[in-house]
Regions:
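Acidic, metal-coordinating helix/loop segments flanking the phosphotransfer/catalytic sites
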Residues: 34-52
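The feature encodes the CheY-like receiver
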Residues: 17, 60, 88
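C-terminal output helix
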Residues: 104, 108-117
């Protein structure tokens, strides 16, 4: 799936993580990468091309909001959608202020999550931070650059 959007799912709930991966993979537009904790997720985000991150707030090794801040500091520009069991306005504000683009409360309907993922990806593609991979090339429309992955 060369044009599939890479979604990184960082959640310590094995069942939810695997179920989300399975459901997203049914849609040919998505390809998933999985991590059970923040440190593994941050490594995957830094080392691979990731289009969007689904990030649980309650991770075993680090609060998801702190993980989001670290993602942003490391240069990740793509959308981050926080997943949480806490529905208060204060939690939503903390999540968005940590650098998240959206905040989804568990339990959620898959159709709603899919719509939010697609909306975030559409919005990001129109931003100055958008980067598209075309075969061995990386295209940065805002700076009008087409870069060969070999460095040229």
């Amino acid at each position: 799936m060369g044009n599939a959007r890479k979604i990184l799912i960082i959640d310590d709930d094995d069942e939810l993580r695997d179920s989300l991966s399975e459901q997203l993979s049914l849609h040919e537009e998505f390809d998933t990468m999985l991590a059970a904790n923040a440190s593994d997720g941050l490594k995957l985000a830094r080392n691979g091309h990731v289009d969007l991150v689904l990030l649980d707030v309650g991770l075993p090794d680090l609060d998801g909001r702190e993980a989001c801040k670290l993602l942003r500091r490391s240069g990740f520009k793509g959308p981050v959608v926080m997943l949480t069991g806490q529905a208060s306005d204060a939690d939503t504000i903390l999540g968005l202020e940590s650098g998240a683009n959206d905040y989804v409360t568990k339990p959620f309907k898959l159709g709603v999550l899919l719509a939010r993922i697609r909306a975030q990806l559409r919005q990001h593609e129109q931003s100055e931070d958008a980067v598209f991979t075309i075969g061995p090339y990386t295209f940065k429309p805002a700076s009008k650059l087409l870069v060969d992955s070999g460095g040229g």
